Amino acid sequence: MQGRTTLERIARAAADFDVHALSGSRLIEARSLAVGLVGEPLASLETMAWVYDRTKLGLLGVTYAGLNGEPDPKDSSPLCGLLGVVPLTIAGNQAVLEDAFNAISPAPAHICTSEEEPAGIFGWGIAVSRHEAARLLVNLGMFISEHIIPTADWYMRAVTDDGARLLKGRMKLTVVEGSKIGTLRMPSHQKAEAFFLQTRGAA
């Protein structure tokens, strides 16, 4: 989990889960998988590519080999799970809260550079063809939230009923107050811990 910047530490933590940021031909494969699983509209390949170039994150993926702990020296195993991790600037975080963040074509000013500290994380979503991949990616997201960016809220917008059940159930996301487009938020680990301690003390 070593890394010079927060975004590097996120990428290294993901690698410990056999999950990796996608670029090049892997992005083409990933977008095709996502379209098949959740449908359009999705961010374009060009958008996914510049988000990766800017952050070295964006769309993270796990392959069948990675999920099964098998070697894949030629990097040829197909993808079976995707997790979008888009780090937000302060302006981007505020835009999400105001329903002004464009998840399909985000403004560069809303997305961190690799050197910046994220004010929040927008999840492009979770798309999986294997149930085990969903569990792995949720666990990765929770690990990142707790151990690497404990002060940052996470946001997502569910596009399928299954996605809504996962986000509201397992991950316990709730609708951002005042959101008219159903933006969901998972409070930062620090906020969640403070709330737990407060409610336990009041019990």
Name these PLM-found stretches.
Residues 71-73, 83, 165-169:
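A short acidic (Asp/Glu
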Residues 98-102, 141, 199-202:
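Short intrinsically disordered coil segments
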Residues 120-147:
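Conserved acetyl-CoA-binding loop-helix of GNAT-fold acetyltransferases
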